[in-house]
Amino acid sequence: MTARAPLPYDFMPPVPSFTLRSTDVADGQMMSDAQVFDGFGMTGQNISPQLSWQGFPAETGCFAVTCFDPDAPTGSGFWHLSLLDVPASVTELATGAASGDLSGLPAGAFCVRNDYNVKAFGGAAPPAGDPPHRYVFAVHALDVDSLASQGLDASVTPAVAGFNLRFHTIARALMIPVYGH
């Protein structure tokens, strides 16, 4: 068995944390079929989980919401969601808000392509027989009102979004459910 990959935020400067909750997923617990990919031999529903957060800094300009699998056998992990420019007044995403046609997203928010090459949430799909993978859901409180004002749009990659998050995150909330089959 190989060692577990580190979490991506282990390599970034520490920032304060705040509270992240969900009615659909839980820290350290197995995700349901609702959050599993529909494809790659999987028959899940590919629905983004409900997420809500509180306790972030008052000076937050906007949020970014990401989901990353550090255990994917790619050498670089796997991005399942990169949602940018969630307004600072929004503290919850409903179940399915970042799925399908994205009609549940707040005004101004946008997704960049995930590693399935889709501008939406892409569910879990670890290889059969792998130990359960970790899915790092993160809500990043940012010091700018929008990343679009910094030149980002829906055409950037998750890596470019992450590069910008590195320099604008003032606090971060994490929840890490797992999935394996």
Per-range role (PLM):
Residues 1-181:
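N-terminus-centered regions that define maturation/targeting leaders and the start
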